[in-house]
Amino acid sequence: MKKSYFKWGAISKRQAKVLTWWKKGSRYASYNGIIADGAIRSGKTVSMAFSFVLWAMTTYDHNNFGMCGKTIASLRRNVLGTLKNQLRARGYTATERRADNLLVVTKGNRVNMFYIFGGKDESSQDLIQGITLAGVLFDEVALMPESFVNQATARCSVEGAKLWFNCNPSSVTHWFYQGWVLKCGKRKLLYLHFTMEDNLTLSEETKARYRSQYSGVFYRRYILGLWCVAEGLIYLQFAEDEQRYMIPQAEVPKLSYIEIGADVGGNKSNHAYVAAGYTAERDVMYVLKAWSYKATGVTVTQYRENLIKFADGIREQYGFVDTIWPDCAEAAIVNELDAHSPYNIRGSIKEEILDRVRCADILFSQDRIKIVEDECEDLCAGFRTAVWDDKHDDKPLDDGTYDRDVIDAFDYSMTPHITQLVRG
């Protein structure tokens, strides 16, 4: 048996309830499941996953269970590594068969199978059809499509099966909030709301660091743990104090990476280019230059010539350009640049738009974005006026009332390094 390196610290009352609600004698033992939502770093996942397997191993033998994440990779990263150590520390054998996406847990003569699923899109429901389950754990259920969750819950036909949900909050109109959180009583589900105070292993310094990472809707969701609507200005911190982020060109340090994001607008919008630089550490984003101009009447050749001229100016000023990232949806533009440009051309990395906004929010919150003054007015104008769409959940308004194209170009210059930027 592999040696376990997991050691439990002090646990909060909510974590203790997660670990015991299903046990004989508990007032909740007859409930159909549990929902644990709330803030990031609040101790939900570590207690939910362990309790799920502990319940399964205590209650069943030779049965199948489901463990679901947004992707299989994210579930392995966020749940399985710690979970296997937790189980080994309690005398269980936990063997992962990666080729089968299966975790086999045994203790004595008792064995159960935990199948791993990813629920990233509507087609994911097909992956879970046909199997009979005695219970399912949904890690970050708010990131999954309703069809996948409905299919997974329908697989739980074994007597006494229970459903386990955890997530960070999203919009109040989200299907999970409307259909499960608000109806937890009717569905006979235990509902627990977590904050960072429920994670007794976090120091005050660590909690303060997490609080400093977010503002606006992300602060309300990830720090306060509230289900809420994204509304108003998207880049509120910039709009309230833009001088806080401006620097003269002379203060740009030696850069190790320079990326140019290039958006392609329609006839009634703009073409836009944004150049961003990063030091070797990639902990600060330096916005070097931005240019946005009307797209009407601009040919593919003219677009290419304008972009090369923009890139030439950056190379002359800073010595190099790593990559130009044109909108990957515009194949004609990408092909034109690839065939007739002296620069390295790659289609843009289109992260989920909410993840892009969240990264920018972290950078603004922690003063880790610096904008070269007098070179980025088009982008600054976009930051000042960008708002959420009040008719579509978690979507920026894109009706031409502000320059969305220059912000998309900004995003494309950021996403090649988004993982390092979020980590700080």
Model-derived segments and spans:
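Conserved P-loop
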Residues: 31-101
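ATPase catalytic-site recognition across NTP-hydrolyzing enzymes
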Residues: 199-265
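Short beta-strand scaffold segments in enzyme catalytic cores
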Residues: 270-277
